[in-house]
Swiss-Prot record:
This is Pyridoxine/pyridoxamine 5'-phosphate oxidase. It is an enzyme of class 1 (oxidoreductase). PROSITE patterns: PYRIDOX_OXIDASE. The lineage of its organism: Bacteria, Bacillati, Actinomycetota, Actinomycetes, Frankiales. It comes from Frankia casuarinae (strain DSM 45818 / CECT 9043 / HFP020203 / CcI3). HAMAP family: PdxH. Belongs to the pyridoxamine 5'-phosphate oxidase family. Binds 1 FMN per subunit. Pfam families: PNP_phzG_C, PNPOx_N. Its EC number is 1.4.3.5. The gene is pdxH.
């Protein structure tokens, strides 16, 4: 109406619709996959964590949760462990993600390894790790990080940065360097127990490769036919074993075992 608003800075903002990246780093076929999702994740994690590949924090992932009412939230977290049971992170249980993990114990992790043109998407349930696991990890943390866990009432509103700095100074006086810092009762680990683990490899013309390990429930009596029937007809393979590390060669699953299928998804 009267020209640009003088109160709005004249920024040279690139048009996001025109930003495009061609993906040509590799391809992913079923024959490239390891027998289990945990072995496949380990192989890709090694690639991402290799110095010089351009991934600054290979263990950084976006962790999405939702409230009991279904309102989502997401944040970047740091993976602190993984095995056939799932992926472990640590947090203040009173934080938003900690509360939502209790109210609605399902979530997702996305590992965005841009430099490799790869991502891994995990979807599953959330459980707390044992107190012993939490204690072991907390005592391995640097002294400053231990004090930080005590200092921050995560996700609460504070008046200023001074609140944190003053609290940290008080804690440093209480537990100086070299003193054992107790593990806060309100702080601990969360394990994301996967139901699906998708491995995504960028390809040309947006025709990306997406291969997903999906858990299929098997009755304890070994009657697996009905469970297999619900697998998608385009499943590219079947893995039998525990939640990522059992017998991949077949056999009758036991109550402690899971059946996994590998599926290709359209990009």
């Amino acid at each position: 109406m009267g020209g640009p608003d003088p109160d709005v800075p004249d920024l040279d903002v690139p048009d996001p619709a025109l930003l495009r990246q061609g993906y040509r780093a590799g391809r992913l076929e079923p024959e490239h996959l390891a027998p289990t999702w945990v072995e496949q994740f380990a192989a890709w994690f090694i690639d991402a964590a290799t110095p010089g590949v351009g991934v600054p924090e290979a263990n950084a992932a976006v962790f999405a949760t939702a409230s009991a009412a279904g309102r989502p939230s997401a944040r970047t977290v740091l993976l602190k462990g993984f095995d056939q049971r799932g992926f472990v992170i640590y947090t203040n249980y009173a934080s938003r993600k900690g509360r939502e993990a209790t109210e609605n114990p399902f979530g997702s992790l996305v590992f965005p390894w841009y430099a490799l043109e790869r991502q891994v998407v995990v979807i599953g349930s959330i459980e707390r790790v044992s107190r012993a696991e939490t204690e072991r990890y907390f005592q391995s943390r640097p002294h400053g990080s231990q004090l930080g866990a005590w200092a921050s009432h995560q996700s609460t509103i504070i008046e200023s940065r001074t609140v944190l700095d003053d609290r940290a100074a008080e804690l440093a006086a209480r537990w100086p360097e070299g003193t054992r810092v107790p593990t806060p009762e309100f702080w601990g680990g969360l394990r994301i127990v996967p139901d699906t683990v998708e491995f995504w490899q960028g390809r040309a013309d947006r025709l990306h490769d997406r291969l997903r390990y999906r858990r299929v429930s098997v009755p304890a009596d070994g009657g697996g036919t009905d469970s297999l029937a619900v697998a998608d007809p385009d499943a590219t393979g079947v893995r039998v074993g525990d939640a990522g590390g059992g017998d991949a060669g077949g056999g009758v699953p036991t109550a402690a075992e899971d059946l996994w299928v590998v599926e290709r998804l359209a990009p």
